[in-house]
Amino acid sequence: MANEKKINAIADAEQAGLYYSSNTEEGFTREIKGETHSYLDSDGKPVKGKRDLKRIEEMRIPPAWTEVWICKEKNGHLQATGIDAKKRTQYIYHPIWTQLRSEAKFDKMSTFGRTLPKIREKYFEDLAYEGNKKQHDLPYERVMALIVRLLDTTFIRIGNETSRDDKEKATYGLSTMQDEHIDFEPTEITDEHDKWYDSQVGGKFTFVGKSNKKHEIEINDEEIPDLPALVMMCKDAKKGKSDDLFLFFDEDGNSQDVKAYHVNEYIQEISGEKFTAKDFRTWGGTKLAAEEISEFKKKDDKKQRKKNITKMVKGVAKRLGNTPAVCRGSYIHPRFINDYLKGSFFRLWKDTLGEQMYPLSESESHVIRYLENS
């Protein structure tokens, strides 16, 4: 699988006029003495070429990086690497490569939307699966379905263990959420005779996410009102064995904390596609943006349209827990913003009216047809 990805990446780079570079090949290095720095070639001699030096300076390689490697060629897809203060390898890519990767991510959004009914049908089924007696009503399938439902409705990041274990600035996502990050309270969202749990509860996540942003996200799910109760079951099932909130039990009754790779494997298994948890955030950002743009006044002039986009991006960024810049560049399909600013959005939006593709919402159905037709 890894070799196949590399072959595809090499082909993509060549098609874009780049070559697939690596920090294992000869390159330039950076030498820091006091408050000054210089760049050396593979023979240890100073780099003197004005174009090379200009290219390197434009990369804005952080001063704190150590073991800096810089590609000798201007068309390498990977332009520089270094080790940051937390001993992590960081990468700087060619702008064309970054744009290619971004476009590829957005290009699959219509396919993701078309696959969502299949994903939802399967996780709805798995949410009802209780496993055997040893699994305490929390088999792998049910817990994965629970987390994917949360991804689908809250757009919370999946998280990773490296960020969770950062002693200075620990941040969290769904797979790394701790017991302390969830609170429960009674709710009357479901009639008494429809309840399967002892008492109907609502839930709220309170945690610090990426970029040190504090999040408060409610999980009162009108379509699946017992979802918070499933989260409560996960919390209650551990009996102090772990601080991690989510866990599942295998067929022998052994518990295992949920990891991000478990969730991504489940998503790929039920979708039949190479989707990941992040695709739910990209889909969510795109859907929210399209919904808000569709509510703008059609007759707004160019100046007002720019203001509207700024307001919209800020709103979506707040919902996703991003900065507006990251939200616009990484989570909102650029076609909606570009078409709106050009004045063609409402015509294209009207042209894609059609029947609701259940279990997708009307706006989700609209977004898919827009991406496929425009």
Where are these regions (language model features)?
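Surface-facing alpha-helical segments and adjacent helix-coil boundary elements at the starts of domains
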Residues: 2-198, 203-207, 216-218, 223, ...
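Extended accessory and catalytic-adjacent subdomains in large enzymes
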Residues: 122-156, 160-374
